[in-house]
Swiss-Prot record:
F(1)F(0) ATP synthase produces ATP from ADP in the presence of a proton or sodium gradient. F-type ATPases consist of two structural domains, F(1) containing the extramembraneous catalytic core and F(0) containing the membrane proton channel, linked together by a central stalk and a peripheral stalk. During catalysis, ATP synthesis in the catalytic domain of F(1) is coupled via a rotary mechanism of the central stalk subunits to proton translocation. Key component of the F(0) channel; it plays a direct role in translocation across the membrane. A homomeric c-ring of between 10-14 subunits forms the central stalk rotor element with the F(1) delta and epsilon subunits. The record marks E89 as: Reversibly protonated during proton transport. This is ATP synthase subunit c. F-type ATPases have 2 components, F(1) - the catalytic core - and F(0) - the membrane proton channel. F(1) has five subunits: alpha(3), beta(3), gamma(1), delta(1), epsilon(1). F(0) has three main subunits: a(1), b(2) and c(10-14). The alpha and beta chains form an alternating ring which encloses part of the gamma chain. F(1) is attached to F(0) by a central stalk formed by the gamma and epsilon chains, while a peripheral stalk is formed by the delta and b chains. It comes from Campylobacter jejuni (strain RM1221). Keywords: ATP synthesis, Cell inner membrane, Cell membrane, CF(0), Hydrogen ion transport, Ion transport, Lipid-binding, Membrane, Transmembrane, Transmembrane helix, Transport. GO terms for molecular function: lipid binding; proton-transporting ATP synthase activity, rotational mechanism. SUPFAM superfamilies: F1F0 ATP synthase subunit C (SSF81333).
Length: 112
């Protein structure tokens, strides 16, 4: 955790180290925004997919354990599991949509 925090602080220090009155071309700024958008989209989607995979694994494990304890509830638990899996997958799809918006319809890029 300390390494990640140090890396983020180092990136922030580089980002804020530019002179305030220095003339900067808008195209150069757009390149940096695009680069950081790709990084943010990749990291965000990766974290969402990791969380979704962990959630799906826990859901399946709990359903299997519940069915093993009470086989009569198997079909009911299976239905509930599929609903839960759909909700978990929806969250990952929402992260994908946000990542695609950040990549292809970025509101921070100034068009000339």
């Amino acid at each position: 955790m300390k390494k990640v925090l140090f890396l983020l602080l180092a990136c922030a220090a580089v980002a804020f180290a530019a002179e305030i009155n220095a003339p900067v071309e808008q195209e150069a700024i757009n390149v940096w925004i695009k680069a950081f958008s790709v990084l943010a989209a990749g990291l965000g989607l990766g974290v969402a997919a990791l969380g979704g995979a962990i959630g799906m694994g826990n859901t399946a494990a709990a359903t299997i354990a519940g069915t093993a304890r009470n086989p009569g509830l198997g079909p009911k638990l299976m239905t509930t599991m599929f609903i839960a899996l759909a909700m978990i997958e929806a969250q990952v799809i929402y992260a994908l949509v946000i990542a695609l918006i950040a990549l292809y319809a970025n509101p921070f890029i100034v068009l000339q």
